[in-house]
């Protein structure tokens, strides 16, 4: 078994003002505190303003000496030209018309959100380049587990996460990615490969960063942007030999690969009334009809 160095990061992009999945900075810090007692070495990328708070949280568990905080003044200056192109795509009406969910406020349709998702893989690469992460690494989202959504007991994270996975980029997926068309995923915003965790050896951090960056560059050539799930799918398509894909579910890879003791929140099947079921079905029918109309109108414009 090999100890994992965890790389994570948090940058305030105004999620508290998002129309969907709105979360404040304090909420994210609370999410981090829930799992921050993990005994592994952690490298955290964040802004100078938040760096002391991150170190304070790890210090609460006596783990300041196993924590490195990298202050990034402006994360959008890491790849400024690429971000500028992404921001231009966000403003294109036809990009939104192409997507099954055309709402410009949907996170996946926003340039700043998608750029931050790309930065996960830059952080992994940069941590290796700086000599801060060696051996087996894992990207773990700063807000992992959403403060107890899947794993119920924060005390369970007081352990050393280790792995016996081999030297490949290990991705975790909701379904078989070989049965998913990457173009349809881009259009329908369907979910397959999960953006976290990603477990890999330090020797492949550079490859993963270059692949995901290349994927985003390819998307903007098509006047599109998308989040980490799409970038990983495209990277997997480009170099499948360096990846190993494991079927799993949200947050579950940590339990399945080294954290078997983590207690789960009991799942309660949501029961809807007959009227609620009808309303939900009508909502999706309406959304699909609107999508079909947008594509039909686009086909007429392009004289298809």
Located regions from the model:
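GT-A fold catalytic core of metal-dependent nucleotide-sugar glycosyltransferases
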Residues: 112, 116-170
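Short beta-strand-to-loop element that shapes/binds the nucleotide-sugar donor at the catalytic cleft/hinge
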Residues: 167-182
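Active-site-proximal specificity loops/subdomain of glycosyltransferases
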Residues: 61-130
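N-proximal low-complexity "stem/linker" segments adjacent to membrane-targeting elements
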Residues: 1-27
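Well-ordered, non-membrane alpha-helical segments in soluble/globular domains
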Residues: 21-32, 152-158, 230
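Membrane-proximal basic amphipathic "stem/tether" segments
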Residues: 258-304
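Catalytic core and acceptor-binding pocket of nucleotide-sugar-dependent glycosyltransferases
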Residues: 146-150, 186-272
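Non-transmembrane, aqueous-exposed alpha-helical and coiled segments at domain scale
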Residues: 122, 162, 173-177, 230-232
